[in-house]
């Protein structure tokens, strides 16, 4: 889908009603006769500690999923029996108008959001009481610790603080066309920003210049929020997976790993590129880069509905082992290396994660207690459904803190040639990350940022 296509999709309203119906269906899979209301609250305005400025606002994702509303201090009710939704927005505060202008009106909110009715927040408890009295056998479905003290469910026979969150987490895994368009837009803006980063390589003298270049392009193209703090890691710092200092000088460094993604109306992009600061990969850097690129390309190629993500992650390790054997860092039998889990010294993280309103989106069913170190940090376990969006982000890293115990352990050290390894420490780490939409018969790569060696070197050099 080209840019014009996703822009056309985004002219419509965020499809919150269809999301609500999907969530109700999921609740009824576990509670067949579920009736009553879904109740959600937005994030509330909160001041910084010892300050009269508000904290940076980040909307609750569960609330946004059923409303498409990015305002603070709001409430939402969905009446299961009538399939009608009500959004509650704050009334006019004359003091606030002086500083911030008029807030959204009821009529404007009805035009903007996919809801059946809009009321003022002052009407919330009366509306709850009316709905509870109209159906005494009903249940109020809400999320634990996300109900304000002044809100009452007295007229409802039951309260359930588990089912709603669980249902939304499952529902969010499969994206509809509008949600995919949001992620496409986030990728589109992020691609522009990543290209600006590549173009900065020949003149930059500090990591922070890459962060600045990325942020400037995103904001200029309408994405004022980042999906996460950008990572601009040069040299050996690239072996730190979530390095966010972004303050080191570039002198004497071979490569830069840029992991950054814009957010578009609460939907994330998550893209990583690694490139040579000189415009030309060193011999060792290119060897590692080509291994990681093969890992990514081969793993993406097998993706489609129903594929077991554990198997794709395992494939990445097999390709990494083959590659590291070919350049001499690893030695011995590849099956024994895999069985011993020695490759985890160089690829310690999972191959990817679901992507959506959160960078590490819901529904992955990770098992961080897994005794198998190869799978412990795999954020998605199970089969991939059509409509899910997942990152594919293999990497090879040379982190002394992680690798040193392997060199001291005879189970692993027999598979590692430390003399060859010593040539690669300055490579730091290489990661390549794209955002992939799973389809019934295959996949679509939503990320268009260049990653082939020749493309990368040309963009940096020019």
From Swiss-Prot:
Under which main EC class is this enzyme filed? hydrolase
**Cofactor field:** Mn(2+)
Q: Quick one: which residues bind Mn(2+) 2?
A: 259, 270, 433
Q: Which reaction does it catalyse?
A: Release of any N-terminal amino acid, including proline, that is linked to proline, even from a dipeptide or tripeptide
Cofactor: how and how many bound:
Binds 2 manganese ions per subunit.
Q: Which domain of life is it from?
A: Eukaryota
Q: Which GO terms describe its biological process?
A: proteolysis
What UniProt keywords apply to this chain's record, in alphabetical order? Aminopeptidase, Hydrolase, Manganese, Metal-binding, Metalloprotease, Protease
Residues binding Mn(2+) 1 are: 270, 393, 433
Annotated function:
Catalyzes the removal of a penultimate prolyl residue from the N-termini of peptides.
Family indicated by similarity: Belongs to the peptidase M24B family.
Question: This chain belongs to which protein, by name?
Answer: Probable Xaa-Pro aminopeptidase NECHADRAFT_60613
């Amino acid at each position: 889908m080209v840019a014009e296509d996703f822009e056309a999709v985004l002219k419509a309203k965020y499809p919150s009603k269809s999301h609500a119906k999907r969530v109700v269906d999921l609740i009824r899979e576990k509670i067949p006769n579920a009736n009553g209301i879904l109740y959600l609250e937005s994030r509330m305005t909160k001041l910084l500690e010892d300050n009269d400025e508000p904290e940076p606002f980040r909307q609750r994702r569960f609330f946004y999923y059923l409303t498409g509303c990015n305002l603070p201090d709001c409430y939402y009710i969905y009446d299961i029996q009538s399939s009608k939704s009500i959004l509650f927005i704050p009334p006019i505060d004359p003091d606030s108008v002086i500083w911030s202008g008029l807030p959204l009106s009821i009529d404007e909110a009805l035009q903007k959001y996919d809801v059946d009715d809009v009321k003022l927040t002052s009407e919330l408890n009366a509306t709850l009481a009316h709905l509870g009295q109209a159906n005494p056998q009903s249940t109020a479905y809400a999320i634990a610790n996300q109900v304000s003290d002044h809100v009452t469910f007295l007229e409802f026979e039951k309260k359930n603080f588990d089912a709603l969150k669980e249902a939304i987490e499952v529902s969010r895994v499969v994206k509809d066309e509008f949600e995919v368009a949001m992620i496409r837009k986030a990728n589109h803006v992020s691609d522009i920003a990543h290209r600006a980063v590549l173009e900065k390589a020949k003149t930059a003298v500090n990591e922070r210049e890459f962060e600045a270049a990325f942020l400037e392009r995103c904001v200029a193209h309408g994405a004022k929020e980042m999906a996460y703090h950008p990572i601009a890691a040069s040299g050996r710092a690239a072996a730190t997976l979530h390095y966010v200092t972004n303050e080191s000088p570039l002198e004497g460094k071979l490569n830069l790993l840029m992991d950054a993604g814009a957010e578009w109306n609460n939907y994330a992009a998550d893209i990583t590129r690694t490139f040579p600061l000189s415009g030309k990969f060193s011999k060792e850097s290119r060897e590692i880069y080509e291994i990681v690129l093969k890992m990514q390309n081969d793993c993406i190629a097998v993706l489609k509905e129903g594929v077991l993500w554990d198997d794709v992650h395992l494939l990445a390790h097999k390709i990494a082992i083959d590659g590291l054997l070919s350049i001499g860092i690893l030695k011995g039998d590849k099956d024994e290396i895999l069985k011993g889990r020695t490759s985890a010294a160089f690829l310690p993280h999972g191959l990817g994660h679901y992507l959506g309103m959160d960078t590490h989106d819901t529904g992955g069913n990770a098992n961080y207690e897994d005794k198998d170190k190869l799978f412990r940090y795999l954020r998605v376990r199970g089969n991939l459904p059509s409509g899910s969006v997942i990152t594919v982000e293999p990497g090879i890293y040379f982190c002394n803190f992680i690798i040193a115990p392997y060199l001291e352990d005879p189970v692993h050290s027999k598979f590692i040639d430390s003399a060859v390894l010593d040539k690669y420490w300055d490579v730091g780490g290489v990661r390549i990350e794209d955002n992939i939409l799973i389809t019934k018969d295959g996949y679509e790569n939503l990320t268009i940022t260049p990653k082939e060696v020749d493309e990368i070197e040309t963009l940096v050099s020019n």
